[in-house]
């Protein structure tokens, strides 16, 4: 055995900092490090890449789904290439509320490790919601993203989502000032990582970001929709922004209404997905 020969045993838990799988059959193996070019997510060869996958629910509430087999099923049986790790900040069990910070960070590290082993892309999502303005927990966010970007310094498959859904009147100027403090912290360790920035009104007002974009490279702006509620008006807003080469990432969507209730609206969902595919916009389903 390897142990008998004095080498390290092969069956050790993969270190989070190891480079992603470069097996050509995996999503990361095919595309490698991503960047943003002319409003599109692209790979090292300049090919447009569309990420598509699932978001977890709050990892504090459903940690059991952060496992290798779940992610492998999503990759192989559901044909996805991306997983979003949703870590609530202010809700019950949230990182900035009464949550166990070390346990939550370990869940994020585990999730990144499994995605890395599978050659999938993975989004670390600072999931603000009832903390409507990301500046409310800005110091915590800065410390978290500093630690995570150091932990994942060798993981080019990681994207960083710095504020899920600003809401309740939080302005783009407020979000922008927050991003201008948080992004440089990530850039210290990951100068080229793709960073996703939420937009006002539960990440619907991408037009506000288009009117006053951030100056950093490799930044995308998030649009969230729930197909039963959000229809032509929001689709038209997205199409206008996409035509003007705004880098947009749909980091969360659902087929029901925005409250999470109601039947799935397949007609509206189909229109949305057709639009996302037309402009090769990445998406994660909630």
Region locations from a protein language model:
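Gram-positive cell-envelope targeting signals
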Residues: 1-17
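N-terminal carbohydrate-binding accessory modules
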Residues: 14-82, 98
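Extracellular glycoside hydrolase catalytic/binding regions
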Residues: 33-34, 58, 63, 121, ...
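Short, histidine-centered active-site or binding-site loop motifs used for metal coordination
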Residues: 55, 89, 126-130, 164-166, ...
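Aromatic-lined substrate-binding rim segments of carbohydrate-active enzymes
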Residues: 67-131, 138-143, 147, 185-189, ...
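A short acidic, helix-capping loop that chelates divalent metal ions and anchors anionic groups
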Residues: 91-95, 131-133, 168-170, 257-259
């Amino acid at each position: 055995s390897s142990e008998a020969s004095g080498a390290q045993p092969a069956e050790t838990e993969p270190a989070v900092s190891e480079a992603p799988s470069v097996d050509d059959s995996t999503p990361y193996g095919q595309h490698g490090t991503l960047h943003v070019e002319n409003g599109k997510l692209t790979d090292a060869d300049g090919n447009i890449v569309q990420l598509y996958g699932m978001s977890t629910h709050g990892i504090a509430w459903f940690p059991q789904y952060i496992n290798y087999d779940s992610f492998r099923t999503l990759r192989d049986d559901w044909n996805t290439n991306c997983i979003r790790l949703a870590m609530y900040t202010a809700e019950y069990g949230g990182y900035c509320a009464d949550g166990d910070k070390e346990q939550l960070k370990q869940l994020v590290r585990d999730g990144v490790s499994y995605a890395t082993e599978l050659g999938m892309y993975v989004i670390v999502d600072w999931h603000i919601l009832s903390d409507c303005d990301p500046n409310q927990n800005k110091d915590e966010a800065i410390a978290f993203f500093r630690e995570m970007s150091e932990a994942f310094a060798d993981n080019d498959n990681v994207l960083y989502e710095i504020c899920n859904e600003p809401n309740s009147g939080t302005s783009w100027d407020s979000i922008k000032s927050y991003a201008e403090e948080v992004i440089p912290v990530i850039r210290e360790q990951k100068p080229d990582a793709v960073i996703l920035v939420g937009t006002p009104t539960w990440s619907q007002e991408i037009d506000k970001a288009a009117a006053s974009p951030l100056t950093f490279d490799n930044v995308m702006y998030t649009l969230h929709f729930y197909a039963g509620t959000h229809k032509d008006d929001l689709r038209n807003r997205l199409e206008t922004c996409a035509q003007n080469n705004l880098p947009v990432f749909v980091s969360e969507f659902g087929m029901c209404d925005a409250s999470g209730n109601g039947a799935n609206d397949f007609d509206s969902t189909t229109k949305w997905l057709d639009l996302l595919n037309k402009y090769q916009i990445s998406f994660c389903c909630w």
